[in-house]
């Protein structure tokens, strides 16, 4: 099991809790607002907004919430002004971490992210030193109880997906950024609901962690980064050694 798979499990559990208190809607709403601000409120002419709306629908965000978020971005409704932040970070044992955030005050968010890193053996990195270790991919996570693996592979790959990974309770569909929208739309059209869907950074090379205490610190760091109110996604290149997998099930 890779670090990404393990983190996917943690993230799914966290998202299940978040959804009960509306945190996911808040995060997705920010993404919609930023997209509308940058490219206008018409999804047909704004691919980024179209993708953000697809993501909102995949987590069952109410239509009224989506429309309000768009209007905040276009200025039709008053609201705070958001901006995107991308933090390149190093964690314990030199693991690489990419943190994406949307904030209304970068001067607040950056020190808070830095503080989380410092307390748990991490640090902010210089621009380009970490991002070169990752590439952007479309990632769609589905509960495996919804569809058989062979049927999903036929459907997803037929629409341009690069890979379908069976992780037991869930499938992880990987696409290029360009094919992400068509694959997600095809899955939605078949009535398949995604637990998570976004274009995010994926590590090109993994970094194995074999020390239990270091692994605990890494997991805690990523949980705290992802728990920050302004953070929209966290991706790392760590991979748990086989000897530690049962410790973190």
UniProtKB/Swiss-Prot annotation:
GO terms for cellular component: cytosol. It is found in: Cytoplasm. Gene3D superfamilies: 1.10.10.200, 3.30.70.980. Keywords: Cytoplasm, DNA-binding, Transcription, Transcription regulation. Transmembrane segments: none annotated. The keyword Cell division does not apply. The keyword Cytoplasm applies. Pfam families: TACO1_YebC_N, Transcrip_reg. One of its GO terms (biological process) is regulation of DNA-templated transcription. GO terms for molecular function: DNA binding. Belongs to the TACO1 family. This is Probable transcriptional regulatory protein LBJ_0543. It comes from Leptospira borgpetersenii serovar Hardjo-bovis (strain JB197).
């Amino acid at each position: 099991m890779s670090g990404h798979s393990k983190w996917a499990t943690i993230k799914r559990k966290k998202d299940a809790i978040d959804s009960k208190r509306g945190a996911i809607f808040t995060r997705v709403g920010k993404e919609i607002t930023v997209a509308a601000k940058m490219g206008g409120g018409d999804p047909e002419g704004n691919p980024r907004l179209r993708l953000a709306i697809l993501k909102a629908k995949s987590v069952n965000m109410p239509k009224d919430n989506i429309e309000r978020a768009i209007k905040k971005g276009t200025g039709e409704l008053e609201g705070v002004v958001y901006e995107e932040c991308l933090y390149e970070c190093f964690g314990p044992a030199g693991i690489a971490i990419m943190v994406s955030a949307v904030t209304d005050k970068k001067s607040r968010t950056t020190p808070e992210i830095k503080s989380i890193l410092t307390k748990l053996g991490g640090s902010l990195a210089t621009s380009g030193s970490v991002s070169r270790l990752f590439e952007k991919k479309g990632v769609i996570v589905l509960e495996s109880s919804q569809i058989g693996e062979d049927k999903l592979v036929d459907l997803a790959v037929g629409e341009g997906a690069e890979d379908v990974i069976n992780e037991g309770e869930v499938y992880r569909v990987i696409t290029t950024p360009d094919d992400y929208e068509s694959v997600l739309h095809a899955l939605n059209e078949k009535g398949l609901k995604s637990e998570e869907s976004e274009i995010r950074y994926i590590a090109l090379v993994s970094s194995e962690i074999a020390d239990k205490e270091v692994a605990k610190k890494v997991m805690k760091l990523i949980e705290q980064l992802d728990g920050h109110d302004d953070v929209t996604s966290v991706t790392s290149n760590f991979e748990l050694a086989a000897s530690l997998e049962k410790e973190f099930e």
